[in-house]
Amino acid sequence: MQILSRITLIIITLFSFCQAQEKQYNVLMILVDDLRPTLGVYGDKAAISPNLDKWSKNAMVFERAYSNQAVCVASRYNLLLGSRSTSTGLYDFGRAFRDFYPEATTLPELYKNNGYYTAAIGKVFHVGHNTYNDEQSWSVPHWHDKVIEYADKGHSKETREEALFANKTWEYPNQLEKGSAWEKLDVSDETYADGRVAQEAISRMDELKGNQKPFFLAVGFARPHLPFTVPKKYWDLYDKDKLPFPTIQSNPKYAPSWAVKRDGEISQYAQIPAAKDSDPFPASLTKDLIHGYYAGVSYVDVQIGKVLKHLQSTGLDKNTIVVIWGDHGYLLGEMGMWTKHVNYELANRIPLLIKHPDMKKAVHSKE
């Protein structure tokens, strides 16, 4: 537990600076699931992300930020514990960190112990796959919502991924059906969890505005994690035939089998054919999945935009440090690989944006 992740160290340094200045800044930490730097601010010309692009004009943009491990639960442990997986031994699902480190102090707990109100909305710690939230970190109970969900009324049976994320079973429940990898219905933003998470964050900020205590508010969004269940209007922003398509769809030459991955998470969805790791998906399926990912990015950009705009409208932005962080990168068919769980650049490079109230212009760090 001796080695702090650089990101956690930055946040703790900000905390120490606030203490030294005798001014206690609030902290709004926004965590986004499976978000690689597919944003305009990071130079992605196809991505439609106007809210984050505009907001980042007065923020610090880290160009070379990486997750310590491209697995949801491990990456979040690394951030919230300030420790690497190589130090903790926490690499995968089903391992509650307090079973191994009962006296550990998490990042939000550090703030809580120093007089802050701490709260979590949405996906902060990974919940699912026999892994649970850490209630000790928060002043109030975690406000949890779904990661896997469908709005289609024809979807009535619980799917494998829904069961896993609901902590109903750890072994893959083969008796349950596979869900769709995407959904594009003409529905409101709040039909899906991220819209509801944004609204709860807005309500919570209204409550906190008159609070005498400073706050550490963690808000976690699920998209663009699979399934790409996103309102149709976000799909309509893109022409799938004009989105970036992987130019190399074969595994790196001489790469050992354990260094590459095609199946696993993505194979839990109905449209995905069973095949060997080296087999690329049909072009039409690849385009649909890439389309869904970009739609998910635009959807979550709007939800984050709602939260940031409300932070400003309440005046809380004048005394709040904002951190926006992706838990790891993502592969969209590049080198024949999908999702994450490998150590290639695309699976590990993340967006990291930090804004202090006194910042007047963007700073791009390549460190």
In which residue ranges do the predicted regions lie?
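Formylglycine-dependent sulfatase
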Residues: 3, 19-367
